[in-house]
């Protein structure tokens, strides 16, 4: 347990930031799942719209240090490739 007031404040801030980061991380995962769901349904237009929203949220996560840039780029690239391959598979 923290004894100094500054350590107590730091502990409070850590809890607060952790909750905010978890919320943002969960939101990113939700938007990725929406894209994957649209891909599985075969709706290319909806998948593209969902991807643009997800891409925005992912890059916001990078800006806020929720995920790393390379991880974000990899996720966006893989989702884009899946959408582009929808025409080829039919």
From Swiss-Prot:
This is Small ribosomal subunit protein bS20. Belongs to the bacterial ribosomal protein bS20 family. One of its GO terms (cellular component) is small ribosomal subunit. InterPro entries: Ribosomal_bS20 (IPR002583), Ribosomal_bS20_sf (IPR036510). Binds directly to 16S ribosomal RNA. GO terms for biological process: translation. One of its GO terms (molecular function) is small ribosomal subunit rRNA binding. Gene3D superfamilies: Ribosomal protein S20 (1.20.58.110). Pfam families: Ribosomal_S20p (PF01649). Keywords: Ribonucleoprotein, Ribosomal protein, RNA-binding, rRNA-binding. SUPFAM superfamilies: Ribosomal protein S20.
């Amino acid at each position: 347990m923290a004894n100094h007031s500054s350590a107590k404040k730091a502990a409070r801030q850590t809890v607060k930031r952790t909750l905010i980061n978890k919320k943002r991380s969960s939101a990113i995962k939700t938007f990725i799942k929406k894209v994957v769901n649209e891909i599985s349904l075969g709706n290319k237009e909806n998948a593209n719209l969902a991807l643009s929203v997800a891409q925005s949220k992912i890059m916001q996560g990078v800006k806020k240090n929720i995920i790393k840039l390379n991880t974000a780029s990899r996720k966006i690239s893989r989702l884009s490739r899946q959408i582009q391959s929808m025409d080829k598979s039919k």
